[in-house]
């Protein structure tokens, strides 16, 4: 058995004295594991850092075997991903999200999204919004997608400001008003056709939205704890956006 694909490194584990088990995300094979011989060598260690894009050849006697990876670098961006807190936490948090999906289950659009986000994690302002959309995409692929296109009660497609915490469907201002205290906020930047950028308040609301449904549908039913990297990422992204929103300091007169 053999296949070749490009991949993004999600992480590695030691295997014996010199080898590692590498975990990668591929466009056509999904999340996949494989042994890398001499993976702890000085040559391979920089290549096998999380976030790097690589070329992978997988070989095994049978399809369900662990198999071996032969890996060549395509884009080494791990160094850049260590420059900001959002990038450091973000690459770990996205890896944890992808581990919620079955191994070897292809999700090509998630691979493409991961690749784009990794190229933009160095910009802490954009990183938060991209990460929220990634969480929504993972929820959708797990079968728990949110419907933010129209009001669940009236069918209206405008003035959508709430999300039902039970159904994950959008609710308009009028229909949701009597239940506002129990509703989740729908940030404007997540609405269909919206081009408005996130501000600190709306980004915080978006993080609360995805956190609620990840716990409701995934973490709690599976008895899982939320990955600590997400908390670090959320805090770093909000701080970065708050700094951007601050008015520029006036130069003191000489």
Curated annotation (Swiss-Prot):
The keyword Glycoprotein does not apply. InterPro entries: ARFGAP/RecO (IPR037278), DNA_rep/recomb_RecO_N (IPR022572), NA-bd_OB-fold (IPR012340), RecO (IPR003717), RecO_C (IPR042242). It comes from the Bacteria. GO terms for biological process: DNA recombination; double-strand break repair. Transmembrane segments: none annotated. GO terms for cellular component: bacterial nucleoid. Keywords: DNA damage, DNA recombination, DNA repair. Involved in DNA repair and RecF pathway recombination. Belongs to the RecO family. NCBIfam families: reco. This is DNA repair protein RecO. It comes from Agrobacterium fabrum (strain C58 / ATCC 33970) (Agrobacterium tumefaciens (strain C58)).
